[in-house]
UniProtKB/Swiss-Prot annotation:
Biased composition, class Basic residues, residue ranges: 1-14, 36-46
Classification lineage: Eukaryota, Viridiplantae, Streptophyta, Embryophyta, Tracheophyta
Family to which the UniProt record says this protein belongs: Belongs to the universal ribosomal protein uS4 family.
Disordered, as annotated region: 1-46
An individual GO BP term: ribosomal small subunit biogenesis
Subcellular location: Plastid, Chloroplast
Source superkingdom: Eukaryota
Any single Gene Ontology cellular-component annotation: small ribosomal subunit
Protein name, entry field: Small ribosomal subunit protein uS4c
Gene coding for it: rps4
Keywords recorded for this protein, A-Z: Chloroplast, Plastid, Ribonucleoprotein, Ribosomal protein, RNA-binding, rRNA-binding
PANTHER family per record: 30S 40S RIBOSOMAL PROTEIN, SMALL RIBOSOMAL SUBUNIT PROTEIN US4M
Length: 214
């Protein structure tokens, strides 16, 4: 299954807030109180509940089905709780790290920056959005004016809707426009700092349980 490129508001109406996918909000529908109330929604099956949690992860981080399954399998073989390791793997991706630093308004924007070779990691161009960031990695835009302008524009737009910087990241501010825009990774992210606040990662693991069992 390919990466989702359809209407983003449609997804957040069904799944709730997905800040990595879009900054938009679904329109508020004002209903006529004189009309009969709608019937109560049917109770969701356990399968659907797990499916929706999986879809939240997939759309928030902008992954294909195959990519997410691969991360679940890697997490299952790692030390520590599988769900927590899965979230750490997703959060430490380069595209998500740029998004959490405020260098992009959404993860798709961050992915474009990486794909178009605007981003340096430890002084070298990295054009792979799935690059796994590590503690002490230094992330910056290239010295090209186009790269600087793009990232500064994203930083300005994210400043209008301030989002707390997670504790595992550090953003260097400078008043000199000639300076490179830089951020660094201080440590592996803690579970409580994950960007998708209401995710129930254990349900995602349960959804994939048959596909990852030996």
């Amino acid at each position: 299954m390919s990466r989702y490129r359809g209407p983003r508001v449609k997804k957040i109406k069904r799944l709730g807030s997905l800040p990595g996918l879009t900054t938009k909000k679904p329109p508020i529908v004002v209903r006529d109180p004189r009309k009969l109330s709608r019937p109560k929604p049917k109770k969701k099956s356990q399968y659907r509940i797990r499916l929706e949690e999986k879809q939240k992860l997939r759309f928030h981080y902008g992954l294909t089905e195959r990519q997410l399954l691969k991360y679940v399998r890697i997490a299952g073989k790692a030390k520590g709780p599988t769900g927590q390791v899965l979230l750490q793997l997703l959060e430490m991706r380069l595209d998500n790290t740029l998004f959490r630093l405020g260098m992009a308004s959404t993860i798709p924007q961050a992915r474009q920056l990486v794909n178009h070779r605007h981003i340096l990691v430890n002084g070298r161009i990295v054009d792979i959005p799935s690059y796994r960031c590590k503690p002490r990695d230094l992330i910056s835009g290239r010295e090209k004016e186009k790269s600087k302008a793009l990232i500064q524009n994203y930083l300005d737009s994210t400043a209008k809707r301030p989002i707390p910087l997670p504790k595992h990241l550090l953003l260097f501010h400078s008043d000199d426009p000639r300076d490179l825009l830089k951020g660094s990774v201080k440590k592996i992210i803690d579970r409580k700092e994950v960007g998708l606040k209401k995710i129930k990662e254990l349900l995602v693991i349960e959804y994939y349980s048959r596909q990852i069992s030996p």
